[in-house]
Amino acid sequence: MLRDIAFEFFIMIALGIFIGYIIAEYTDNNLWIVVFLLLGIFCAFGRLFKMIKDYEKR
């Protein structure tokens, strides 16, 4: 369970940074990295709460 949570956090945040970096390279605006990093963190917490809710149902 703990490994799944860590994996979900890492994937969401890394994906956000990666997408933000790609957009930042094309637009020459590094603000996109921060925006997608925060979006990745938000999605990671959303997945965490969903995993906790699913775990409590069992």
From Swiss-Prot:
It holds the Pfam family ATPase_gene1. Its main location: membrane. It is found in: Cell membrane. The keyword Transmembrane helix applies. GO terms for cellular component: plasma membrane. It is a multi-pass membrane protein. Coiled coil: none annotated. It comes from the Archaea. The chain crosses the membrane at residues 5-25, 32-52. Keywords: Cell membrane, Membrane, Transmembrane, Transmembrane helix. This is Uncharacterized protein MJ0149.
